[in-house]
């Protein structure tokens, strides 16, 4: 593993956590690494900003570790939020991705909004992050069209599943939006819903993982349940996935 990745792991004190920022070489590097190593790459995408995608990406790495899955995360968002929050800068994208492949089962890729088509095409699976609100409901059709076009031109045929974040069951609008999305997208909406919890927001702003600062919180329970539902890992039957 390269020295700067080792330094990052020490800085975060989280075994198996690595954030890297890389540029144009990323899609080809991901493809070559997948072919050689069997790494499962997962793009976290959203059509609209502000849905909590980056915070989920960071904290899902720890949730996977709790399940025994060796996970890492990289940042391809032009805004570089993940990199800015957790502080790593890549020197050699191709070398970095290959090092991660040797030591990880799952690689989460944090993207921008709207997501870049190259990441959509090269991922093994896509997690579409959405909030239960009018903006996300209105964007369902547009995102679905984008996903269909992606599958048509991608040899990997990535499966897309929808993750609902920041849900508050006390709000009627949230309940109605969730019901509408499940009607439109079922069974592709994940059963696990990440409930709204201030602990996640506060931990992210503090550049910490929520498992460390609020281990008994609702959002930690939701993230752990999400990791169990997704169940990615080396040897998973990702080539048999169908919509």
PLM feature segments, named:
Residues 2-46:
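Extreme N-terminal, non-catalytic leader segments
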Residues 45-51, 59-122, 141, 198-210:
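P-loop/Walker-type NTP enzyme "switch/lid" segment
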Residues 54:
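Walker A/P-loop
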Residues 106, 124-128, 161, 187:
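Well-ordered beta-strand positions
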Residues 123-144, 168-170, 174:
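Conserved Switch II/interswitch segment of TRAFAC-class P-loop GTPases
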Residues 140-156, 165:
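Conserved C-terminal guanine-recognition region of P-loop GTPase G domains, centered on the G4
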Residues 166-173, 178-211, 223:
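Beta-strand-loop-alpha "switch" segments that mediate conformational coupling across diverse proteins
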Residues 210-243:
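NTP-binding/hydrolysis catalytic cores, primarily Walker-type P-loop NTPases
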